[in-house]
């Protein structure tokens, strides 16, 4: 199964962490969208519109900023989900995956792709700021899941 876009991104970034935390616990934290702020300091307010499934909308407000509307575009229960934000002609696509590494280890992967009109300029300008907190956010996620 191809988790990535068919369109070639103009900017991409991926970060992964390995953990002994239970995959089910990580998935429960991901699927509990209303409580993402417990492990993601980059969220001031968040609202899930509909069930956590393909087509769901998520209104996420970073501290001191306007809300960002995300749409869940792919979801494999217990394995992965992808959300997209659109700004003009730009598409910011983030895929979150759980990769089993054996019975008691998991690789947690976040991947962002920025594509669309103007992405070759905008991607390098905005992408690093958006993904800068991923190492801390992912560390907090797996730490909470391990409890």
Language-model segment annotations:
Residues 113-147:
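A conserved amphipathic terminal alpha-helix motif
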Residues 1-50:
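Hydrophobic ligand-binding cavity/cleft-lining segments
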Residues 21, 38, 67, 132-136:
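Generic recognition of short, well-ordered alpha-helical interface segments
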Residues 37, 51, 61-109, 113-118, ...:
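Hydrophobic-ligand binding "helix-grip"
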